[in-house]
Structures are given as structure tokens and as C-alpha cells.
Amino acid sequence: TVRVDNIGNYPVLLFSSVVKNALSKQGEDPLFILSPPAARIDPGKSQLVRVMLADPPGLDKTRQQMRHIYFQEIPDMGEKSNQLKVNTRHRVVAIATPSALVENKSPWQTLHWQQNGHSIQVKNLSPYVIRLAPSITVQPSNQQFVLEQPYLLPGQTIGTRKSDRLTSPPSRLHFTPISNTGRAIPDITVNLAPIQ
């Protein structure tokens, strides 16, 4: 359950939705069901949104699944027509772990990092969702790179931004894993695999 508070001075309409990611099935796979999907919240009041785990057919029960849950507020425009009010949207990461999957507190140890041309590539070899700070540092040049996204789904491979290019041959890199509770873990240093 997620509690959403309206700390503003006007009522808002709260819309809650689940967004699929790159490895979701192309069809509908309602992994999480939100209730209520829409609700009015008056100033100083709260709304509880229940996040329920569904069991869609064909769901891979050998690996973790991740979805983004969005909470979007739509402000009441009131009676004045010449006002500007801004919609805000907040994203929360929701990860479902199959009961048969053993807990792993450091799944980032299974990441496979390598040079790919003038960029860096990382593959998640585990059945776990791995979250990372998007910035990595390549050694010995101390060059900064930014990953395409701040997470890797099981079996997924991502690279660094296309605008980031290596200036010298790298031998290792530093990255910052993010724990299941959203906290940054101290930097990890790994050796880079040879170019393939």
C-alpha cells in the first residue's frame, strides 16, 4: 500500500498507473493491479493506493519482474480561467520476486562489463533486477560515462550513451549499485572483459 498526501491548498485528482518495461510481454501482462486507479484528494487529506500482485498467464517465475508505478496529480482548475497549474508525476519502482527465487543481496556481482568499440557494455547474467547509479567511471583515464538506463532486467544488455566515447583503452571501471531499498552501495571496482 502506498499513501499519497495532498499537502497543497487545492484538491487534486490522483491517477495511478503501471508502466511496462522493455522485457514485458508485448500483450497485456497486468503484473500489478492498483486500487483505486483514480481518486480525488482534498487539501490536507491522504489517499491509500493498494498495489496488488497479479498472476498473469505466461509469467516467467524463474526471475524477478520490474514495473514502474506512476502517481500523477491533476490539479483542480477552480473558477479562475487565467491560472497556471502544473501537473506532477512521481515514479516508484516495483519489483516482484518469485517465491522460489533465493534472495541475493548483491546481484551486481554477476554483471559482465566489457568494451564495445568506443563505448562500454554491461550484461545482467542473473535472474535479478539490478539497479545502478547511471554514472560510471572508467580507469585509468578517469573518464565518466552515463548508462542508457539506471537498471538491468534479467538477461538484459545495455550500453553507455552514444555520445560517450572512450579516449584511451580501459582496464577497469567503478560503478555504484543501488540496493533493493533504493540506497546507494559504496562504489564497486571491476575489471573489463577483453573486446569481443
PLM regions with names:
Residues 116-196:
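Intrinsically disordered, low-complexity segments enriched in serine, threonine, and glycine
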Residues 9-11, 46-48, 64-66, 89-91, ...:
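Extracytoplasmic
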Residues 24-57, 141-168:
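Intrinsically disordered, low-complexity Pro/Gly/Ser/Thr-rich segments with frequent PxxP/GP/PP motifs
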Residues 1-5, 103-115, 151:
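Beta-sheet-dominated interaction scaffolds and their linkers
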Residues 7-26, 127-142:
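Short acidic, flexible loop segments centered on an aromatic residue
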Residues 13-17, 48-52, 68-70, 93-95:
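Soluble periplasmic/extracytoplasmic beta-strand elements of cell-envelope proteins
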Residues 1-5, 51, 67-72, 119-124:
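Buried hydrophobic-core signal for structured, non-transmembrane domains
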Residues 56-101, 105, 167-196:
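Terminal connector regions
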